[in-house]
Amino acid sequence: ASAERGLFDLIFMGDNLNADPRAHPSYTLRLEPLTLLSALATGTHRIGLGATVSTTYSDPFTVARAFASLDHISGGRAAWNAVTTSNAAVGANFGTVHPDHARRYEMAGEFVDVVKGLWDCWDDDAVVADKVGGVYIDPSKVHALRHAGEFFKVEGPLNIGRAPQGRPVVLQAGGSNAGLQLSLIHISE
């Protein structure tokens, strides 16, 4: 409440998928950001709620569902910071070899497109909620994604209705040429 009175605009939670006890404690000890932001959503009404989630070590369906859920819980205040995860040590936590820089950004472009596509599987008016007529969802307004790309195969649709914002905000802070291209082609609308 104090933050909202102080015109605070966004709570942004970074994330790190690797614990290095030699690093600064803020990089080592972290709550999972979407869970924390969901709790914070119940005590705020205006502040945006942004979380970092990796496109290299996550899957698009789960990310789309989680941010759509946060958007519903918060009344349309969710934001996703899409990162490719530069720390090679993270790969060991997922039983895989860390992809090189170029490959991570190729994956990220497809990942972001799939997430946005899943958010768009539900038309704005798909949830009818007609008690008298006995119709809750208009199936003609819910569409499969049927994405089959180089890195991801996702059928869809998402199993949560359209987010209050339509699509939660997507952020990306990579400053390399690949990061700028990701923002230009896949993130900016």
Listing of model-derived features with the role each one plays in the protein:
Residues L10-R30:
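Glycine-rich, proline-tolerant flexible connector loops at the mouths of alpha/beta enzymes
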Residues L31, I47-P60, P99-A102:
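Aromatic/His-enriched, Gly/Pro-containing loop or helix-boundary segments
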Residues L7-D15, L49-G50, W80-V83:
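Short beta-strand segments at enzyme active-site cores
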Residues E4-R5, S38-H45, D71-G75:
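Acidic (Asp/Glu)-rich catalytic clusters
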Residues I185-E189:
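Conserved small/polar residues in nucleotide/adenosyl-binding loops
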Residues A23, D59-Q181:
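Internal, glycine-rich beta/alpha segment that forms the wall or movable "lid"
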